[in-house]
Amino acid sequence: MNVAIVKYNAGNIYSVIHALKRLGITPTLTDDAELLAKADKVLFPGQGEASTAMAYLRQHDLDRVIPELRQPVLGICIGQQLMCRHSQEGDTDCLGIFPLDVKRFQPQQHTDKVPQMGWNSIHDLKSPLFKGIGDGEFIYNVHSFYVPHHEDYTIATCDYILPYSAALNRDNFFATQFHPEKSGGVGEKILRNFLEL
C-alpha cells in the first residue's frame, strides 16, 4: 500500500511515521502534488500555528491539491483544523473541506487549563474509522483550539470545557483532533481502520 504524509512546516510528523511503521507501512513524506494524488491513502498530521501552516500550504499549492484528493485522507490535530473553513488562530482562512470554524477554548472557571493536554474519552462514535473501538475509550490530546459539534460532520465527540468534535468526516476526508499515533492500542486500531478504508 502506498501511503503518503503531507510534508509542511508542522511538528509531530515523525511520531506518525513511526506509528505507521509499527503497522508495517513505510510512508512517503512529500509536498509533491503528483505523489499525493497517486497515493492510496494520505495523512495530514501535525502540530503548529494555523496561519504559518496555511502560508506554507499556499506557497506549495497544497491549498489547491489537498481538497481535490479523491482517496481517503486523514487529518490529525492541526490537520483537522486546517481542513476547516476558518480558524480563530491568527484569523486564518483554511482549506474549507469542512464548512466549519475553529475556535479557541475559553476557560469557564479557574480550574480550566488551556491547552488541553493529556488523556480524555471519546463518545458518539459514528464511522468505520472507529470499528472495534468502544464508546468512552481514551485518546491523547494536545490542543488549544477545537471544532464545535456539527450534526452533519461530527463522527466522535469529546468534552473539555464544552463538548466538541473529536473527529470529522465528509466524503473521503476524515480528521481527528486527538493524536491516534500517541493513543496506544486504541490509536493504533484507529490508524489500522483508516488504512483499511
Regions found by a protein language model. Give the residues of each.
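Extreme N-terminal starter segment of soluble prokaryotic enzymes
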Residues: 1-4
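Cysteine-nucleophile active-site neighborhood
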Residues: 48-116
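Structural motif
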Residues: 43-45
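An anion/phosphate-binding loop that grips the pyrophosphate of nucleotide cofactors and donors
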Residues: 39
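Beta-strand-turn-beta hairpins that frame and shape the catalytic cleft
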Residues: 136, 169-174
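Short, surface-exposed beta-strand/loop micro-motifs that present aromatic residues
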Residues: 162-169
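Pocket-forming structural segment of enzyme catalytic cores
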Residues: 85-162
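Acyltransferase
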Residues: 176-197
